[in-house]
Design a protein with these regions (language model features):
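Conserved active-site alpha-helix within GNAT-family acetyltransferase domains
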Residues: 100, 125-144
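Glycine-rich phosphate-binding loop
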Residues: 97
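A generic structural signal for beta-strand entry/edge sites
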Residues: 79-81, 118, 158
Length: 176
């Protein structure tokens, strides 16, 4: 049985293994496989105008094995919003609902907390065929916001998707 918990720098080795199990994702968004140190980068990288105190790593653990990971920035890019920078599940466990379970645990963790009303993420066009069906099932909808995506050898677009999280009276009304 998997357990939801925080993921920090001390867990970089477990996250690196998870990322290496998903080399296809790295190829789609940056044009090459997972680099050494990718986990450390995922655990420390911040978007513009964010500070380290806003960053949270969440995971599903089975013993010492990290089965799924999400990088969340609280209150970014504006107060009331949490941005999911990455959500990844073990490619050896496809079909077990790990991504969905991690997302549900994050929603439960964040719903009504810290004045958050919205979850936000960016889907890179080069990864959209894989990502969009999952995020639609999780209740996200595309917005009109689009930004350029340049990483490694990949030049693409990044599209912002959002879903309500619930805040105040909304939070006690249940799922959105």
């Amino acid at each position: 049985m998997s357990v939801f918990g925080l993921v920090g720098l001390q867990d970089a080795r477990a996250l690196q293994r998870l990322m290496e199990s998903n080399a296809g994702y790295a190829v789609r968004i940056q044009g090459h496989g997972v680099e050494p140190g990718a986990a450390q980068e995922a655990l420390t990288a911040l978007p513009p105008n964010a500070v380290a105190a806003q960053k949270r790593g969440y995971g599903l653990w089975e013993g010492n094995r990290l089965l799924a990971f999400a990088d969340v920035i609280i209150g970014w890019p504006e107060p009331g919003t949490a941005h999911i920078g990455l959500l990844m599940a073990d490619s050896e466990r496809v079909g077990e609902g790990l991504g969905r379970r991690l997302h549900e645990a994050i929603v439960t963790e964040l719903r009504g907390a810290e004045g958050l009303c919205c979850l936000r993420l960016a889907i890179v066009d080069a990864n959209a065929d894989v990502a969009e069906p999952f995020w639609k099932k999780m209740g996200y909808q595309p917005t009109s916001q689009v930004a350029a995506h340049r990483q490694g050898t990949v030049e693409s677009a990044s599209r912002i998707w959002r879903r309500k999280l619930g805040c105040g009276a909304e939070a006690s009304a249940g799922p959105n």
